[in-house]
């Protein structure tokens, strides 16, 4: 090879990282505020200055709030009777039990709805109630109260009281029908409240304008748990494993009451007596005593959600509340298989949708017949991460397009579409996500509305979502003790994110693929005398580029890898860029 060509090749290889290793997120460094007094307080609690800085930045800034954060207590749970209409709800349910009425618990088809319904079912049965649980089918019943389902249960099964869990505040038609048939409806919900509320017998909701409940961010299962505590007149500790699952699955704020509920709930999960949960953990290859919030978020919740995404969600109630070993095993196996099927369906739609992307468009509106509407939100989220654009993925059936949107931070999808409700048969959502149904003929109008919105706003349509970097890590002083110190901030989740660290000035010693289909990547990096492994899920195809890249910078989280009796510190890659 001529020397000039050789030099050009070397220069290209040195530049190749710039083209191929590009960050998924816009990196944002947290302010490094060090408060001397709080650092001393944190030191007394056994926390180093780096943890103190992070806590201070997250609003934990005095001794009392630190103690409550590090040592959550059930005694700090708020009085359930502070919730709007709790007294009316409890009185009506007790009356129904005393009179032997048939009660319907009407839930939702996701993990929060499943656990909410299970919580209320077990509580009512403790009081001797005759109750029936129904979780609506996503495909035939839709979300929330369904008038025809209500009518069926009232007429065919003699239901005279309906208690909704994790739904109801938008169920005007069904609730009006039930009330007109002489059946009271008690709504327990946590979703955004419409301007006009349904005419229900009672509405128990943490954000109700006529009450001042101290914590607004309970999940549906949290509200159900509050009802259970009020009915049974004490904190129902044995229900907290269900509360933890629903709360983590619904990605609500893990602060205040939710932090308490999840902390205790995870402990309960560690020695759960629920045979269905034991079966699920066994099938996922997880020992009960190893359960943490990530186990729920990545193993238990997706399995429960898969059932509601693809099929009838009602077997989940038998799984969570049943006592039959054989039945629990069969349902857990069926749910496991549904989850595997869900993964295959998502991958198939994702690959098909990718071929439909229009590079000229600022927002991708992708619609096709034959796509399972239960998984389109997942597909839209994956495409958003890959493209850095707002994505809407819709299934076409009988002349209508129904699906989900996921949006970058720079584009408020709800603000963009809310003024154009005439486009939709149904529409709802918030800044980052939305669900919608519209006539197929209006798809081009939908696309144009979004393109116009972006142009008029001057929004950065390809703006990446922000990644908050908490601190820069010194690899040469990093140890297992560092990990343990930060783990005292767990459980992690919304508003208490797992700390993300910035590392640079290290040497990549090796990069190798791992996992099924070589999908994942493991780097060995070093700095001075220190060396660590970095695991990067889904990055296997970039092994060569990572091995050759100079001046690599990583955003990572810390974890502990236990294998064959050995314990080692491991870094988990969140994002990568080149300096």
Residue ranges: model-predicted function:
Residues 21, 30-35, 40-161, 181, ...:
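Hydrophobic helix-and-loop "lid/oligomerization" segment in the mid-to-C-terminal part
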Residues 21-22, 98-99, 327-331, 337-366, ...:
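Mid-to-C-terminal polyanion-binding domains and interfaces
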Residues 151-221, 225-230, 255:
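Active-site cavity-forming subdomains of large catalytic enzyme subunits
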């Amino acid at each position: 090879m001529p020397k000039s060509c050789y030099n050009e090749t070397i220069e290209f290889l040195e530049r190749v990282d710039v083209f191929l290793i590009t960050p998924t997120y816009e990196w944002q460094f947290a302010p490094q505020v060090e408060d001397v007094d709080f650092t001393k307080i944190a030191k007394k609690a056994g926390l180093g200055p780096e943890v103190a800085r992070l806590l201070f930045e997250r609003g934990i800034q005095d001794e009392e709030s630190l103690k409550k954060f590090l040592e959550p207590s059930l005694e700090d749970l708020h009085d359930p009777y502070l919730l709007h209409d709790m007294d009316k709800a409890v009185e009506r349910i007790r009356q129904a039990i005393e009179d032997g009425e048939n009660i319907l618990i009407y839930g939702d088809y996701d993990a929060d709805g499943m656990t909410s319904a299970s919580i209320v079912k077990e509580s009512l049965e403790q009081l001797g109630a005759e109750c029936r649980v129904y979780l609506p089918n996503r495909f035939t019943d839709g979300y929330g109260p369904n008038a025809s389902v209500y009518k069926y249960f009232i007429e065919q099964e003699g239901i005279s009281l309906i208690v909704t869990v994790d739904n109801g505040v938008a169920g005007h038609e069904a609730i009006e029908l039930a009330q007109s048939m002489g059946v009271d409806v008690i709504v327990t919900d946590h979703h955004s409240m419409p301007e006009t509320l349904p005419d229900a017998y009672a509405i128990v909701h943490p954000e109700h304008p006529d009450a001042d409940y101290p914590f607004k961010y309970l999940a549906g299962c949290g509200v159900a748990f509050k009802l259970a505590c009020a009915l049974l007149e004490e904190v129902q500790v044995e229900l907290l494993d269900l509360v933890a699952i629903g709360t983590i699955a619904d990605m609500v704020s893990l602060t205040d009451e939710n932090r308490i509920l999840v902390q205790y709930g995870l402990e309960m999960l560690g020695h759960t007596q629920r045979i269905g949960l034991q079966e699920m953990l066994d099938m996922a290859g997880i020992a009960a005593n190893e359960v943490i919030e990530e186990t729920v978020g990545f193993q238990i919740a997706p399995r429960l959600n898969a059932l509601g995404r693809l099929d009838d969600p009602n077997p989940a109630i038998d799984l969570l509340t049943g006592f039959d070993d054989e039945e629990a095993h069969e349902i857990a196996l069926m749910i496991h298989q549904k989850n595997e099927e869900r993964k295959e369906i998502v991958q198939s739609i994702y690959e098909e949708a990718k071929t439909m992307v229009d590079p000229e468009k600022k927002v991708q509106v992708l619609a096709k017949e034959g796509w399972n509407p239960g998984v389109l939100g997942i597909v839209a989220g994956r495409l958003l991460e890959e493209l850095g654009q707002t994505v809407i993925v819709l299934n076409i059936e009988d002349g209508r397009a129904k699906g989900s949107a996921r949006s970058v931070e720079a584009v408020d999808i709800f603000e963009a579409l809310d003024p154009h409700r005439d486009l939709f048969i149904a529409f709802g959502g918030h800044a980052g996500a939305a669900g919608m149904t519209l006539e197929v003929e209006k798809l081009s109008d939908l696309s144009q509305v979004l393109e116009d919105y972006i142009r008029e706003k001057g929004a950065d349509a390809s703006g990446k979502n922000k990644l908050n970097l908490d601190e820069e890590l010194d690899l040469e002083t990093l140890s297992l003790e560092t990990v343990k110190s930060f783990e005292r901030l767990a459980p992690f989740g919304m508003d208490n994110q797992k700390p993300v660290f910035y590392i640079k000035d290290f040497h990549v010693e090796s990069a190798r693929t791992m996992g099924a289909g070589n999908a994942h990547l493991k780097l060995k990096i070093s700095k001075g005398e220190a060396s660590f492994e970095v695991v990067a899920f889904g990055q296997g195809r970039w092994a060569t580029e990572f091995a050759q890249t100079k001046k690599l910078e990583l955003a990572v989280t810390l974890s502990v890898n236990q294998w064959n009796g050995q314990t080692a510190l491991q870094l988990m890659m969140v994002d990568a860029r080149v300096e």
